[in-house]
Amino acid sequence: MNQQLGDHYAVTESADFLLLSNLEARPATVVLQTCQRMLARIRRNLGALAVEQGMGKHVVIVFADDDDYYAYVSNYYPEGGEYAMSSGMFIRAGYGHFVVPLAIMDAMEPVIAHELTHCLLQHLPIPAWLNEGLAVNTEHTMFPQLAMPSAQKYFQHEIPARHAAYWNADSIQTFWSGKSFLATDDGNALSYDLAKKITALAAGDEPAFRAFVAEASMDDGGVAAAQHLGYPLERLVQAVLGEGDWSPKPERWRRDVERGQF
């Protein structure tokens, strides 16, 4: 990989990370220190849910520009599709690693927190909505300014109407399957918003929520929720969207699900 990117990319390392980038020594050290600091915090937050896999250190790739970044991540999407833009991605294929395009450190920090959360949850077969909900809420816990109304894509008064216009009995199935997180329309942002909200609601009873996360599966259609949370998944969506046919129907998408980790 280093050879393919060219001589201006180099590997630097810390106690728990290997970083491939074109950064000078000092900026590379700052990135690694940031990764180490966030790893400690996220481990504390996730507790026993965070199980680290692999034969060694976490691998982080910081690409010099967006072109290099998208050229790389395109290898992990099906050919011929159109997908939402992204600022980082955890890639589970092969030796799990996460990738980000180079930006100012203030912009990279929350992306690193988000993708590192995915990294620490990679052993769990959880659905995309839960994977992303946990990652976004972890990111917002560490960087609360990102949860402020001024940092959102839409004005607060617009969000309920946009949800109401987008979600119905059919489109909600793309949320449960994870496909809506890859949408190039409003479905992308609305999926993340819905995921973070219903994940936060489910986490209200922390012991029950942790048991749910440990047992949830991409295609169980809410079995783990009924068992550990004590209510069906659609009740969480109902609390955000109001009345509707929100129940997951895994028979419609069980063979075509996304893990999250976007």
Language-model region placement:
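N-terminal low-complexity, Pro/Thr/Ser-rich intrinsically disordered segments
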Residues: 1-4
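Acidic/His/Gly-enriched intrinsically disordered linker/tail segments
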Residues: 79-96, 107, 125-262
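Juxtacatalytic substrate-recognition/specificity segment
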Residues: 6-127, 144, 221-228
